[in-house]
C-alpha cells in the first residue's frame, strides 16, 4: 500500500485513477455493445419476421379469397 496514489510505472497515472475510469468505460462500452448486439439481432430477425408474416398473410388471403386479385384488377 506504500504505492497508493503513486503513478504506475509506464502508465503515468495514479493507482486509484484507472479503476473508476476503466469501470465507467466498461459500463459504457457494455451498454453500447448490448445496444449494437440488439440492433444487429433486430436487423437480422426483423426481415425474417416480416417475410414470415407476409407469407402467412399472402397464403391466407389466396386461400380464403382466391378472386381478390382478379377483382382488384
Curated annotation (Swiss-Prot):
Record localization: Mitochondrion outer membrane
Lineage of origin: Eukaryota, Metazoa, Chordata, Craniata, Vertebrata
Gene Ontology CC terms, in alphabetical order: mitochondrial outer membrane
Stretches of the chain forming a coiled coil according to its record: none
Additional notes on this entry: This protein is produced by a bicistronic gene which also produces the major prion protein/PRNP from an overlapping reading frame. The alternative prion protein/AltPrP and PRNP (AC P04156) have no apparent direct functional relation since a mutation that removes the start codon of the AltPrP has no apparent effect on the biology of PRNP. In mouse and hamster, the alternative initiation AUG codon is absent and is replaced by a GUG codon.
Positions of transmembrane segments: 32-52
Protein name from the UniProt record: Alternative prion protein
Keyword tags: Membrane, Mitochondrion, Mitochondrion outer membrane, Transmembrane, Transmembrane helix
Cystine pairings recorded for this chain: none
Tissues expressed in: Detected in brain homogenate, primary neurons, and peripheral blood mononuclear cells (at protein level).
Highest rank taxon of the organism: Eukaryota
Membrane topology qualifier: Single-pass membrane protein
Induction: Up-regulated by endoplasmic reticulum stress and proteasomal inhibition.
Location, primary (coarse class): mitochondrion
